[in-house]
Amino acid sequence: MAIIKPNRDLKPDGVTVVTREVWAENLESEFELISEIIDDYPFISMDTEFPGVIFKSDLRFTNPDDLYTLLKANVDALSLIQVGLTLSDVNGNLPDLGDDLHRGFIWEFNFRDFDVARDAHAPDSIELLRRQGIDFERNCRDGVESERFAELMMSSGLVCNEEVSWVTFHSAYDFGYLMKILTRRELPGALGEFKRVMRVLFGERVYDVKHMMKFCERRLFGGLDRVARTLEVNRAVGKCHQAGSDSLLTWHAFQRMRDLYFVQDGPEKHAGVLYGLEVF
């Protein structure tokens, strides 16, 4: 099992981060690349974009079972828009894919499942994503089919692999959408079964930065951008609410948090818990 080592330099001098945009036409070739490097870059940071939430709770504080019921209702009814993946090695380096231009690469998958003219969504969420550059019309025309994405992801080494670790931020919905796509069915009816499928697909080394914030000496709060600012971590590429960019910012925030607050005992004891659901 690989141990995550401290990395003081989150963006080495001279390295340019490039987002690899994935559409239907290059889906298979990009998964071929990922499959070839996953053994050397087993740390996966993930973010998704989806059409907001259409079912909401009247209660400010609810237990994990109630929160899961709400999550399931939304995920079952809605469709994924983007998935961002950042792969890293044990020292925090991004894959260069043999490039000699001092570039590191991350991935952003664009899906065709969601049709803004047809499907349920939260209008404010859609407007926010439009402002951040998501082209819903192009997604419908050129985007990835979730069924083919699932087939390729299942055989890529990203899932059902005990050697990988996942790093996320407030990720119950993110994993919910991935589980829905990978299993090709609605989410399990109960939180306990959701936990079981999570372990099968993603293993036990799942780190949710939002959960880990509770155990930092310095008080951290808010969303990803606010936490990153507090940790003095800059966005290396792209904009907020772009899944590829957010996956990289999540990885950098995790690295900084680990180096500041988890030097003595490491972050491993906080693995396997999704914020709000107390998963695992």
Curated annotation (Swiss-Prot):
A divalent metal cation binds at D47, E49, D174, D246. It is found in: Nucleus; Cytoplasm. Component of the CCR4-NOT complex, at least composed of CRR4 and CAF1 proteins. Keywords: Cytoplasm, Exonuclease, Hydrolase, Metal-binding, Nuclease, Nucleus, RNA-binding, Transcription, Transcription regulation. Ubiquitous transcription factor required for a diverse set of processes. It is a component of the CCR4 complex involved in the control of gene expression. Belongs to the CAF1 family. Coiled coil: none annotated. It catalyses: Exonucleolytic cleavage of poly(A) to 5'-AMP. It comes from the Eukaryota. Its EC number is 3.1.13.4. Its cofactor is a divalent metal cation. One of its GO terms (biological process) is defense response to bacterium. GO terms for molecular function: 3'-5' exonuclease activity; metal ion binding; poly(A)-specific ribonuclease activity; RNA binding. This is Probable CCR4-associated factor 1 homolog 9. GO terms for cellular component: CCR4-NOT complex; cytoplasm; nucleus. It comes from Arabidopsis thaliana (Mouse-ear cress).
